[in-house]
Amino acid sequence: INLDLSDPERLKQQLQGHQFLYVVHAAGATKCLNRNDFFSINTDGTRHLADALIALHMPLKRFVFISSLSVFGAVREQQPYTEITEHDTPKPNTAYGQSKLKAEQYLDSIGNDFPYIILRPTGVYGPRERDYFLMAQSVKKHIDFAAGYRQQDITFVYVEDVVQAVFLALDHGRSGRKYFLSDGEVYSSTDFSNLIRRALGNPWMLRIKAPLWVLRLVTWCGEWRARLTGKITALNNDKYNILCQRNWRCDIEPA
C-alpha cells in the first residue's frame, strides 16, 4: 500500500479493512527546499498516521517511530564533552530536528493507550546514503575539508544496526520510551576521514580546515542555488548548523 500521509481522510480509507499489530514509521524527509515541508512531512505525517490507527481501533502491540538525535541540537557543547541524555532539554537547531521533535511531542500527548517507542539514531551510514558518500568522494579526490577549529566529537550507526534495533524495539521495547542509537564509539572529524581514506586504499590527501564563516558562505550559496534550480542540495542551512555542532555524543546505555 502506498499510504498518503498528507491526507488524513484518504489515509483512513487506505487503512480501512486492514489489521496491523506492529507498525514501523520510518517515512520522512531529511532535506527539503522549503522549511515548512519538513513539518508537513515529518510532523503532520506522523500525526495523521497515529490518528488514523487510533480512529480505526487498530490492535497495535508496538508503534516504532524513527526520530533522530537531531531533536536535541547543540546541548552539552562545553568541553570536556559529555553524552546527551534523555533528561536534557531538546533545543533543535535545524528544521529537520524541530519537525522530528514536534512529532515526538505529539506521540507523547496521545497517552498510554498508544504503544509507541521512539528511536533516535545518530548519523546513519550505509547503502544509498548520500551525505557521507559525498565525503568519500572528496577524500577520493584527495581533499579532506573540515570546518571550525574547536574539537568536534561525532558518532555514527550502521543502517543494519538500526534495523536490528527496530526488531528489538518491536519485541521488547517499553511503551513511551525513547532510545538513542549509535555504535558506541566517538570519532573526531580526522578519525572519520582517516577511516574513509583507509577504505579507499590510502590515497594521498590534503587536509583543509577552514573557519566556520567559510562554511556559512558555502551553505548560503548552496541554499540559493537550490532555490533557483529547484533541486535539493546537501549544502544547506541545516547542514551548516549540523557541522557547527561540536558534540554528538549520546547515552545509549538505556538501549
Description of each model-found segment:
Residues 169-235, 252:
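Mid/C-terminal beta-alpha module of Rossmann-like enzyme folds, strongest
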Residues 5-44, 48, 69-74:
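NAD(P)H-binding glycine-rich loop region in Rossmannoid oxidoreductase-like domains
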Residues 48-95:
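Conserved Rossmann-fold NAD(P)-dependent oxidoreductase catalytic core, especially the SDR/UDP-sugar
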Residues 91-119:
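Active-site Tyr-X1-5-Lys
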Residues 72, 117-134:
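Flexible, glycine-rich beta-alpha linker
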Residues 102, 129-134, 148-170, 176-177:
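Substrate-positioning beta->alpha
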